[in-house]
Amino acid sequence: MAEYIYQMIKARKAHGDKVILDDVTMAFLPGAKIGMVGPNGAGKSSILKIMAGIDQPSNGEARLTPGYSVGILLQEPPLNEDKTVLGNVEEGVAEIKSKLDRYNEISAAMADPDADFDALMAEMGTLQDALDAANAWDLDSQLEQAMDALRCPPPDAEVKHLSGGERRRVALCKLLLEAPDLLLLDEPTNHLDAESVLWLEQHLASYQGAVIAVTHDRYFLDHVAEWIAEVDRGHLYPYEGNYS
């Protein structure tokens, strides 16, 4: 039997008198593409934060299955104010970039006649397997293409000077390159032009992980979602198919 990537079991969450989740039980599989809809103030953003582990239910359970990763695009995403646009985007690929840098270091070290060639070759082989699996040999090109597609500001721009929309595009670019197993998107098409939205739709259509997107953009949902989860007065109602 397939393993769920995420589960809520009798989850309840309230902010004062406002009920966000009322005894909700739900689960979905890896690779699911879900659009979350509902009226403003229904608690959709709060549900995403619970799924991301930023918040917790008051009662019941909400858990990501161990071994899976999760990432979220918040409406006001945090960025590293001490880094440039490129520096923030590179955080999304920090682990694989360090492997690529180490591979290049070993390649240079092999020119030393006194090097321990057996040890270096063994390490290089391990790194090559990881880089092959991540399709990381053209990493710089992948970053450049994603930043261009999402209309990110210039790579050397300081994020502390960016507008809210520019910050969201940088955060979205970083998150997509990070490629978590569960991708949570809060209004992902806000501040994107039509070409960027089209690129995002195509990217998510082939995305290997699960995607949950909160959005009012019904055209986006028609192109991305395979299920719709409607949030209404603390309850969550799933429907198979896209928005239309």
List each model region and its residues.
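ABC ATP-binding cassette signature C-motif
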Residues: M1-S244
